[in-house]
Amino acid sequence: MAELATIARPYAEALFKASLSDLNGAAVWVEELETIAKNPQLLQFADNPNVTAAQVYELIAGIAQGALPAMAQNFLRTVIENGRLSALPEIAAQFRVMKNAQSGSSDAVVYSAFAIDSTALAELAATLEQRFARKLNVSVQLQPELIGGIRVVVGDEVLDSSVKARLEQMKMALTA
């Protein structure tokens, strides 16, 4: 079977080209469809041979917050009819990468042991943008196992200033 990234690439490229006039608008509904498509029960329903593509489409359209734009409807129908619903999260990820490349920004995930308030997050985002020398779309995910501090992932770069990482470094130094 082909890799999911290989399957998703033509869909992401076509979606990107078709939505160049409104990338931000498309990003909103692509993200929503991605979230919906990650549901294992939905994927199981869609894989049922007794369920039609129209039924899957109606279910997803019904779950979506508000009405989907015409482009989103056409895109979703195409993905479902081609049996690629399970590839939708990867399509969305590749679309996001293309959108970020177009705008000169990157996604940054900040893993934190504790919740970060909006003021601190804004300051952190500004600092990270200087550190990584580009505009960042920052999101936060809680990871209590970090004990304290943060771990930032921007593309393939990782900045880890968590207590857990420091303890691991100390452990390595002591056992070396």
Swiss-Prot record:
NCBIfam families: ATP_synt_delta, PRK05758.2-2. The gene is atpH. It comes from Albidiferax ferrireducens (strain ATCC BAA-621 / DSM 15236 / T118) (Rhodoferax ferrireducens). It comes from the Bacteria. Its main location: membrane. Belongs to the ATPase delta chain family. One of its GO terms (cellular component) is proton-transporting ATP synthase complex. One of its GO terms (molecular function) is proton-transporting ATP synthase activity, rotational mechanism. SUPFAM superfamilies: N-terminal domain of the delta subunit of the F1F0-ATP synthase. The keyword GTP-binding does not apply. F(1)F(0) ATP synthase produces ATP from ADP in the presence of a proton or sodium gradient. F-type ATPases consist of two structural domains, F(1) containing the extramembraneous catalytic core and F(0) containing the membrane proton channel, linked together by a central stalk and a peripheral stalk. During catalysis, ATP synthesis in the catalytic domain of F(1) is coupled via a rotary mechanism of the central stalk subunits to proton translocation. This protein is part of the stalk that links CF(0) to CF(1). It either transmits conformational changes from CF(0) to CF(1) or is implicated in proton conduction. This is ATP synthase subunit delta. It is found in: Cell inner membrane. PANTHER family: ATP SYNTHASE DELTA CHAIN. F-type ATPases have 2 components, F(1) - the catalytic core - and F(0) - the membrane proton channel. F(1) has five subunits: alpha(3), beta(3), gamma(1), delta(1), epsilon(1). F(0) has three main subunits: a(1), b(2) and c(10-14). The alpha and beta chains form an alternating ring which encloses part of the gamma chain. F(1) is attached to F(0) by a central stalk formed by the gamma and epsilon chains, while a peripheral stalk is formed by the delta and b chains.
